[in-house]
Amino acid sequence: MKTYSRISTLLALFLTLALVPSALAQQQNQKNFPWMNTSLSPDERADLVVKQMTLDEKINMVHGQGMLGWANKTFPNMHLGNGGAGFVLAIERLGIPSLQISDAAYGVRSSAQNGRYSTALPSNLASAASWDTEGACEYGALIGRELRAQGFNMTLGGGVNITREPRNGRTFEYMGEDPILAGTLVGHRIKCEQGQKVIGHIKHYALNDQESGRNEVNVKIGKREMRETDLLAFEIGITIGNPGAVMCSYNAVNGDFACENKYLLNDVLKNNWKFPGFVTSDWGGTHSTEKSSAAGLDMEQPEDLFYGPKLKEAVEAGRVPMAQLDDHVRRVLRSMFATGIVDDPPQRSMIDVEAGFETSRKLAENSIVLLKNSNAILPLDRNKVRSIAIIGHNADMGMISGGGSAQVDPPGPPPKWLQHVWFPTSPLKAVKAKAANAKVQFDSGSDPAKAAALAKQSDVAIVFVHQWTSEGEDLPSLSLPDKQDALIQQVAAANPRTIVVLETGTAVTMPWLDKVSGVLEAWYAGSKGADAVANILFGDVNPTAKLPMTFPRSEADLPHPTVRTPPPGAKDIALRMKAQDEPTYSIEYDEGLKVGYKWYDAEKKPVLFPFGFGLS
């Protein structure tokens, strides 16, 4: 038995050693490929690869290989993915690695289901409130590092749709209502993200300014109005950040779906702006083969309904020119070479959790906006305040985060789609740590009378309220949900020394504003949001952030007082399973150039808090 075991071991060792020269030779051959010459430009290197590719290799380069749970399908190559949003096959014989793609709006998504960890940063809207390009750079660099540490080489972050509709469920993913501010900050985020050797990304191109009817709606807008508002943010972001990829959106614009819209993709993006990278569809946002290819869509995600066998057949039949397919492929390869993911593929490594926490806290401190400070209630004097009431749902446990494909997983099991997720950053604990000599008590606010009683017997009441928003749905109104306005009213009536901390993804109305002494807008504050809030409350950090969007008095003052939803009988379904030539219904952005503060100024409408407002 021992002899047999020894022989087996020696045989295995012999076979392993026999394979080593072959593997080393293959690696050496790949290094000698002419496109591995780093002195060549990304364009030159990409051109050399394209000339060596077969038709099947080219087709595989322009579509995804599936996503776990997508459309209840199984995909044969899923074992080659990295557990993210999707992937593109490697071309191993030519030394080209796979694209491993992850959502990463405010941190790397889906880490829990893959046994990993990701830092949750403050939301993109919070980042915009900092008005800080260096902070935006830190934001992108951290996400880039954590993407690579988890084995990803492409991000799906970089949202920059401007705030035309503040009830949009994805407002928290974007950079506010001003195209110059939004484009500048997203550009610096992307630039520093790509500095970590991942493909950066900007989305959703274009005019995906609401979630209601996003797969069905046709946006009507003039070309000048489009170019000087929504597209301007993209133009600035692309100029500064030079992202490797642009994601086209679900909606149609002036009659053509964005992912087959020649004006958006070829005329403006590639020809006018000279964008050298590639355009990928939003997930399930491709509607055709020949029209999409001719319009400038380079990649279908996350599967191959239109850019797999159908595209191959169209090329072979001459309906899609080979030169057109080559351009799609070359653009993908160019971005891979330009960002360094071919020369230096990511290697999985441990994430520096403490460094992530430190960055998240610092960015949150720079993003919290002080909206009201009557009688200088802030900063709180820890030597004078003897009793503090902490009131609010889950304020003893954590702070709310934004949902959908942006959702960063907290420690523990992966959350379900559209589940409300609270990060374990406890306001109660953070305040207790700052006010060690005070009596700090908690009430959930589920019984407003009980919460008011606690507030009445306390020197100060701090009410933490939240507004959950997510991809896939818009808010019915800008009011706080779950009767939280009434809770604040009752607490403030019991103790006018009430401070409200808003955890929101967009603007909110404040019928109680004149009854409270202080208001902080903390947005979705990330992994260390509670510490950041406490540092502001007690004066360890001076708030410097300014609003990146207008807070209106009510929905009646908006350009469109009601969210425009699909008409009766029209379902807002994902069109990933079929082609569709026409969107179901249209909305007209008749406010034109008057977006955000320009609307309120031109229409002489008073606001609750103007764009750019923030106290110190």
Segments (PLM) and residue ranges:
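Bacterial N-terminal signal peptides
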Residues: 10-20
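Intervening/peripheral non-core polypeptide segments
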Residues: 1-2, 20, 206
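Bacterial N-terminal signal peptides that target proteins for export
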Residues: 1-11
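Glycoside hydrolase catalytic-domain context in secreted enzymes
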Residues: 25-616
